[in-house]
Amino acid sequence: MKTKIIVIVGPTAVGKTALAIEVAKRFNGEVVSGDSQQVYRGLDIGTAKASPEEQAAVPHHLIDVREITESYSAFDFVSEAKMTIEDIQSRGKLAIIAGGTGLYIQSLLEGYHLGGETPHEEILAYRASLEPYSDEELAHLVEQAGLEIPQFNRRRAMRALEIAHFGQDLENQEILYEPLIICLDDERSQLYERINHRVDLMFEAGLLDEAKWLFDHSPNVQAAKGIGYKELFPYFRGEQTFEEARESLKQATRRFAKRQLTWFRNRMQVTFYQIGESGVQDRILSQIEEFLDD
């Protein structure tokens, strides 16, 4: 029997952490971060980690598990998340995956093989390279490759191209989980307002000092490439004013949120909830209760 888990995804600043904590309290659960940047110690403000108080109220996992000089990959995430979920389940609790790194979460849920002749990172990189293509462009690539896909859809096209590219069937190897995937969303202008406000709050909380510490110590590591830090480096180099750097960060975060939504919409089977609608949290909790009781 597959393990039932709750997955909460959505764009940055939409309220994933708050909902995950509420779900954990309601259903005796623990939160597993699905965020590629929250693994780094010392990067707290720019990655929007749950506060110490929130982490004390509900156990959180895969936060602060790497130094900023260390790399972290989808392979690492899947391996560590599997062990974490198994541990949570063994204690009779519910695992709640919450985060915005779609590639990591999708790899976990769909059970992609992490070994074999083709390195997993190469497979993931190829999948990510196909993501920007429109449906028409993907159809053209399929045609060029001499492939036939009855009832074309995006997922089938990407799968067929992947098999053709690597010369082997990389179909899911072992699906361990039965997930309920909840995707939070908001009306676009409201979401962008939330993002702008969050960035302002981050600066008030000390983001500039945190980013400067990263810039001074390790400006070229993987951890420094995340949204929230690299946008401020031109300011530290004297290439932009502070206001220009802050606006650059807001703009980059808005674009990132748009890419996140595109990923969840096209690559994962999610149930969308508009956070601005009345009673939305109650509806989500009811759906989770029905899912767990089924």
Curated annotation (Swiss-Prot):
Q: What residues bind substrate, as annotated?
A: T12, A13, V14, G15, K16, T17
Q: What are the names of the required cofactors?
A: Mg(2+)
Q: Where is this region: Interaction with substrate tRNA?
A: 35-38
Q: What is the lineage of its organism?
A: Bacteria, Bacillati, Bacillota, Bacilli, Lactobacillales
EC nos? 2.5.1.75
Q: What is this protein called?
A: tRNA dimethylallyltransferase
Is Iron tagged as a keyword? no
| InterPro entries in UniProt | Dimethylallyltransferase, IPT, P-loop_NTPase
Question: What reaction gets catalysed by this protein?
Answer: adenosine(37) in tRNA + dimethylallyl diphosphate = N(6)-dimethylallyladenosine(37) in tRNA + diphosphate
* Sites annotated Interaction with substrate tRNA: T101, R127
Q: Which gene encodes it?
A: miaA
